[in-house]
Structure formats: C-alpha cells, structure tokens
C-alpha cells in the first residue's frame, strides 16, 4: 500500500532488489486477473473503472467505466485466446455482465436487464460463456434469491439492424448544430 491505497508493484522472487512501483492512483486496486498468456493483468480501479496493465511495457489502459461497490468482489475473466475480457459490474443496483473486445477496443453490455447476473466465465473452447443469474427477480433491496447457472452461445447473432430500427431512423428529425431541442417561445 501507499498512503493507505493499494498499488501495483514488482519485486524479484529471491528478494535481491527493492520493490518497484508500477501503478498507483488515489483509490484502491482490487480483483487482479492475469491473462492466460501472462501478457496482461486486468483489475478494478476504485469504484468506477476496469483497467488493464500490459506486462511487457508496464503501460496501463482504461477499458471501461462501470460501477463497482467497494464492499463486493467482482469477477474478471479473460477468454482462452485472450481477445476478450468478461466482467461483472453494477447497473441500477443489479449485476450486469460486460465483455470488452481487445481487437475492436469496444465494450458490450451482454445482459442489459433488470435482473442480477454475474460471475462470467468462458468455456475452454471459447464458444460459450457461463454465468449465474436470477431471471425471475431482482437482488435489490432484499438479496439475490436463488441463482442458476446459464450457458450463452457466443455467436454473431443480429449482425443486421432490426427492421424496426431501420424504420425508426427514416422518421428521425435531423438535429441542427448548436440546437439540442425545439424552443417555440
């Protein structure tokens, strides 16, 4: 720790050199998870960010802004080819499962529901994700209730926009620059 906050350090296993600080912020670092090829370490920074440390050059990159409650532990898991990071975070008092693509540098909310989901884990072949959820009730304010394990296939469904979205776009009013809404006064 440094001034009460956790930080990332390296030290030789034989103790022949002093510790060297890699990364420090004015908040705690928790839930570290190393990738399978040992090139990246993902972690939760404070209460609102998922970060990734590149082991080769010790650079740190912010992957996502998300909400994490201080008293809870959150699971972060790399896919077996290390191209994805799955993690759980809080959204509207309920757990949500997110996936970050290292190739696309894009974040996806995989569940996006009013139910509580969490503990994402990839199958060894990379075709499925397992998670736990209570699809019939919320966890807030009375607790999680009975959770079950679910398997989601990781395929590119819905690669085309829905017809209703295309239809709605036809009738969207164009927004003029500098104007965010109509004011008839």
What kind of feature is each model-predicted range?
Residues 1-9, 16, 23-29, 39-57, ...:
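A flexible loop/linker signature enriched in serine peptidases of the S9 family
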């Amino acid at each position: 720790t440094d001034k009460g906050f956790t930080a990332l350090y390296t030290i030789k296993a034989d103790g022949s050199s002093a510790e060297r600080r890699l990364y420090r912020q004015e908040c705690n670092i928790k839930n570290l998870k190393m990738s399978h090829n040992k090139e990246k370490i993902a972690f939760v920074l404070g209460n609102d960010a998922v970060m990734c440390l590149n082991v080769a050059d010790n650079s740190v990159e912010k992957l996502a802004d998300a909400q994490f409650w201080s008293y809870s532990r959150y699971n972060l898991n790399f896919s077996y080819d290390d191209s994805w990071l799955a993690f759980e975070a809080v959204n509207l008092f309920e757990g949500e499962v997110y996936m970050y693509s290292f190739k696309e540098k894009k974040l996806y909310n995989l569940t996006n529901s009013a139910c509580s989901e969490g503990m994402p884990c990839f199958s060894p072949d990379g075709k499925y994700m397992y998670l736990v959820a209570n699809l019939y009730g919320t966890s807030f304010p009375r607790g999680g209730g009975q959770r079950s394990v679910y398997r989601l296939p990781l395929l590119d469904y819905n690669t085309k926009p829905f017809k209703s979205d295309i239809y709605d776009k036809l009738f969207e009013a164009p927004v003029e620059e500098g104007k965010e809404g109509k004011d008839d006064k």
